[in-house]
Regions:
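Intrinsically disordered, low-complexity regulatory segments
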Residues: 1-161
Protein backbone atom coordinates (compact mmCIF):
# COMPACT_ATOMS: atom_id res chain seq x y z
CA UNK A 1 0.00 0.00 0.00
CA UNK A 2 1.19 3.52 -0.85
CA UNK A 3 0.30 6.97 0.48
CA UNK A 4 -0.46 9.94 -1.76
CA UNK A 5 -0.48 13.38 -0.13
CA UNK A 6 -2.29 16.26 -1.84
CA UNK A 7 -3.12 19.74 -0.61
CA UNK A 8 -6.94 19.79 -0.56
CA UNK A 9 -9.66 17.48 0.70
CA UNK A 10 -11.60 17.81 -2.56
CA UNK A 11 -8.58 16.58 -4.55
CA UNK A 12 -7.98 13.74 -2.10
CA UNK A 13 -11.51 12.38 -2.53
CA UNK A 14 -11.35 12.50 -6.33
CA UNK A 15 -7.88 10.96 -6.51
CA UNK A 16 -8.85 8.24 -4.02
CA UNK A 17 -11.65 7.20 -6.40
CA UNK A 18 -9.18 7.04 -9.30
CA UNK A 19 -6.53 5.02 -7.46
CA UNK A 20 -8.71 2.64 -5.48
CA UNK A 21 -7.91 0.68 -2.33
CA UNK A 22 -4.24 0.11 -3.18
CA UNK A 23 -3.55 3.70 -2.14
CA UNK A 24 -4.33 5.93 0.81
CA UNK A 25 -4.92 9.51 -0.34
CA UNK A 26 -4.69 12.22 2.33
CA UNK A 27 -4.84 16.02 2.27
CA UNK A 28 -2.26 18.08 4.15
CA UNK A 29 -4.33 21.27 3.94
CA UNK A 30 -1.60 23.40 2.36
CA UNK A 31 1.46 24.67 4.18
CA UNK A 32 2.47 22.40 7.06
CA UNK A 33 5.47 24.39 8.26
CA UNK A 34 6.58 27.99 7.95
CA UNK A 35 8.88 30.57 9.49
CA UNK A 36 8.43 31.14 13.22
CA UNK A 37 6.01 33.96 14.08
CA UNK A 38 8.45 35.88 16.28
CA UNK A 39 9.05 39.46 15.14
CA UNK A 40 12.59 39.27 16.50
CA UNK A 41 13.54 36.11 14.65
CA UNK A 42 16.95 36.17 12.99
CA UNK A 43 18.80 33.35 11.28
CA UNK A 44 22.44 33.10 10.43
CA UNK A 45 23.77 31.56 7.27
CA UNK A 46 26.98 30.28 5.77
CA UNK A 47 28.44 32.48 3.07
CA UNK A 48 26.73 31.77 -0.22
CA UNK A 49 23.84 29.81 1.30
CA UNK A 50 20.32 30.70 2.30
CA UNK A 51 19.64 30.97 6.04
CA UNK A 52 18.35 27.78 7.64
CA UNK A 53 15.61 28.93 10.01
CA UNK A 54 13.84 26.52 12.33
CA UNK A 55 10.58 25.73 10.58
CA UNK A 56 7.51 25.81 12.81
CA UNK A 57 4.15 24.11 12.40
CA UNK A 58 1.30 26.04 10.82
CA UNK A 59 -2.06 26.04 12.59
CA UNK A 60 -3.52 22.52 12.74
CA UNK A 61 -0.79 21.01 10.57
CA UNK A 62 1.01 19.02 13.26
CA UNK A 63 -2.20 17.15 14.10
CA UNK A 64 -2.93 16.52 10.41
CA UNK A 65 0.59 15.25 9.69
CA UNK A 66 0.61 13.06 12.81
CA UNK A 67 -2.63 11.43 11.61
CA UNK A 68 -0.97 10.75 8.25
CA UNK A 69 2.10 9.29 9.96
CA UNK A 70 -0.08 7.02 12.11
CA UNK A 71 -2.11 5.87 9.12
CA UNK A 72 1.11 5.23 7.14
CA UNK A 73 2.44 3.14 10.03
CA UNK A 74 -0.82 1.24 10.61
CA UNK A 75 -1.19 0.39 6.91
CA UNK A 76 2.50 -0.49 6.37
CA UNK A 77 2.93 2.11 3.64
CA UNK A 78 5.84 1.45 1.30
CA UNK A 79 6.04 4.55 -0.89
CA UNK A 80 4.88 8.06 -0.14
CA UNK A 81 3.96 10.23 -3.12
CA UNK A 82 3.82 13.95 -2.39
CA UNK A 83 1.44 15.45 -4.96
CA UNK A 84 1.24 19.08 -3.91
CA UNK A 85 0.62 21.79 -6.50
CA UNK A 86 3.16 22.14 -9.34
CA UNK A 87 4.37 25.60 -8.33
CA UNK A 88 6.85 27.28 -5.98
CA UNK A 89 4.60 26.98 -2.91
CA UNK A 90 3.65 23.39 -3.70
CA UNK A 91 7.32 22.52 -3.99
CA UNK A 92 8.02 24.14 -0.62
CA UNK A 93 5.21 22.12 0.99
CA UNK A 94 6.58 18.95 -0.62
CA UNK A 95 10.08 19.73 0.70
CA UNK A 96 8.78 20.11 4.25
CA UNK A 97 6.75 16.86 3.97
CA UNK A 98 9.84 15.04 2.65
CA UNK A 99 11.78 16.23 5.71
CA UNK A 100 9.03 15.26 8.16
CA UNK A 101 8.46 11.78 6.71
CA UNK A 102 12.20 11.13 6.35
CA UNK A 103 12.70 12.04 10.02
CA UNK A 104 9.90 9.57 10.85
CA UNK A 105 11.84 6.78 9.13
CA UNK A 106 10.32 6.72 5.65
CA UNK A 107 12.84 6.68 2.82
CA UNK A 108 10.87 5.93 -0.33
CA UNK A 109 9.33 9.37 -0.80
CA UNK A 110 8.62 10.62 -4.31
CA UNK A 111 7.47 13.93 -5.76
CA UNK A 112 4.65 13.84 -8.30
CA UNK A 113 2.84 16.65 -10.07
CA UNK A 114 -0.12 16.89 -12.39
CA UNK A 115 -1.80 19.81 -14.10
CA UNK A 116 -5.24 18.23 -14.27
CA UNK A 117 -7.08 15.96 -11.88
CA UNK A 118 -7.92 13.21 -14.35
CA UNK A 119 -7.39 9.51 -13.87
CA UNK A 120 -4.91 9.43 -16.76
CA UNK A 121 -2.85 12.39 -15.44
CA UNK A 122 -2.74 11.01 -11.91
CA UNK A 123 -1.67 7.53 -13.03
CA UNK A 124 0.96 8.94 -15.41
CA UNK A 125 2.38 11.19 -12.69
CA UNK A 126 2.90 8.20 -10.38
CA UNK A 127 4.92 6.52 -13.14
CA UNK A 128 7.08 9.65 -13.57
CA UNK A 129 7.80 10.31 -9.89
CA UNK A 130 10.90 12.36 -9.15
CA UNK A 131 12.55 14.37 -6.40
CA UNK A 132 11.81 17.84 -5.07
CA UNK A 133 12.94 20.72 -7.31
CA UNK A 134 15.27 22.60 -4.95
CA UNK A 135 15.40 25.62 -7.27
CA UNK A 136 11.67 26.16 -6.68
CA UNK A 137 12.12 25.50 -2.95
CA UNK A 138 14.90 28.10 -2.77
CA UNK A 139 12.64 30.59 -4.56
CA UNK A 140 9.89 29.96 -2.00
CA UNK A 141 12.34 30.34 0.90
CA UNK A 142 13.66 33.64 -0.49
CA UNK A 143 10.11 34.94 -0.89
CA UNK A 144 9.31 33.99 2.71
CA UNK A 145 12.48 35.57 4.06
CA UNK A 146 11.88 38.76 2.08
CA UNK A 147 8.26 38.93 3.25
CA UNK A 148 9.44 38.58 6.81
CA UNK A 149 12.46 40.87 6.63
CA UNK A 150 11.00 43.58 4.41
CA UNK A 151 7.24 43.14 4.45
CA UNK A 152 6.77 42.97 8.22
CA UNK A 153 9.05 45.96 8.83
CA UNK A 154 7.54 48.01 6.00
CA UNK A 155 4.06 47.27 7.33
CA UNK A 156 5.04 48.34 10.82
CA UNK A 157 6.65 51.51 9.44
CA UNK A 158 3.61 52.33 7.29
CA UNK A 159 1.24 51.82 10.22
CA UNK A 160 3.29 54.21 12.37
CA UNK A 161 2.40 57.20 10.18
Amino acid sequence: MDLVIVESNAKSKTIQKYLGKEYIVEACGGHVQDLPKSNNATWSNDDGHLPKPPWGWTKGAEKTVNKMLKKASDKNVNTIYVATDPDREGEFIAWRLFAIFTKAGYHDIQRVTFNAITKKQVEESLEKASDVDMNLVDAAIVRRLMDRLVGFRASKFANSW
